């Protein structure tokens, strides 16, 4: 994707709202070894408080005021409490990275889910990046929208609501 966007003069944007600081300190881009032109982040950058951020290559960011002509503002811009919480969270993640431990727990969860499904003869697949894990009720790999659409969504709903009923949310 990176090569394709560069060849065609297209800005590559990564939405790290889900993966940023969750799968690795450098987000999904550090795992996959792809540097986008712009990155967006969500509330993790605010330590769980409402805050959003974006950043990118110097030549793009130079277009943002005060240096450039593009005005950017928002409800979640620069809240001091969220910013302080974000700095504390990011400092903690950098100084005491939890990623290896989280992945080891996810390994156990994934193996347990697969074993339980096999025991009850339920077809399922797991997709995973770092500690982010998704369970699909299907017999084949889920690699795109078409394969995801073929999953047993009714079984997933039963699974989901069963977890909720047990207080697992």
Name the predicted role of every residue range.
Residues 1-169:
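Conserved N-terminal phosphate-binding loop of PLP-dependent enzymes in the Aspartate aminotransferase
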